[in-house]
Amino acid sequence: MHNDKQRKYLENIVQGNVIEGRKDIAKTIRNYLCKSYSASKVAERKFEYFQGIKKEQENIIAELSYSNFWWVNDFASNYQYLAEGGEAKVYLSNCGTKVLKINDAVYYNTWLDFLNSIILHNIYFINTNYDLIGFYNIDKTLYAVVEQPYVVANKITELDAIKIHLSNNDFQHKKRFDFCNEKLGIYLEDIHDENVLTFNDTLFFIDTFFSL
């Protein structure tokens, strides 16, 4: 459940309004893009249709990264390659407490959608906060560089536990591993035991996909 201030904050994200408060890279770029673009809707998962818009946003992010020194040029000395999924390469920090995810937002229609997803994740799942530290460009492909606490599970995650946890934030189970907060119009997809880990009966949502 959310208090009035939190609810208004979430409504501003959904409605495409500028969000106030402490600014980080994700919020700064998201607010900038919202001046010219709207988030795509969950029913509009049409990558080819949004390809031009996504490229425009990529160019804007590149310009902002140059002017604000957001390019990440070297991380190899502090991280070791760990794994690779559909959209991200994952590296483990040398100290073993954090992971670095290099994400090209391939599953999102636009970069604005990707940034909204990061911001929503950080509201709902504080213990696995995404810290967007900058961007990385290789072979003409833009990647977001995101740091997150490293979590090791000691128990299998049960879907019923996920349902209970999410229902406390007004997310209702819709089908398979998808949930929806109908009051706010926020969708949360692909929530299963590989993306949600359990340690000492605490759930850690390590990989989420929010959409509006």
Language model segments and positions:
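Active-site ExK catalytic segment of metal-dependent nucleases
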Residues: 99-105, 149-151, 207-209
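Short Pro/Gly-enriched beta-strand edge/turn motifs at strand-loop
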Residues: 69-76, 171-179
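Conserved hydrophobic "DFG−1" position in protein kinase catalytic cores
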Residues: 92-93, 150, 198
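Protein kinase-like catalytic core scaffold
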Residues: 98, 144-146, 187, 204
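ATP-binding glycine-rich loop module of kinase domains
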Residues: 41-54, 61, 75-127, 141-143
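Juxta-kinase regulatory segment immediately upstream of eukaryotic protein kinase catalytic domains
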Residues: 1-77
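Conserved structural core of kinase catalytic domains
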Residues: 104, 122-177
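Catalytic activation segment of kinase domains across protein kinase-like and atypical kinase folds
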Residues: 180-212
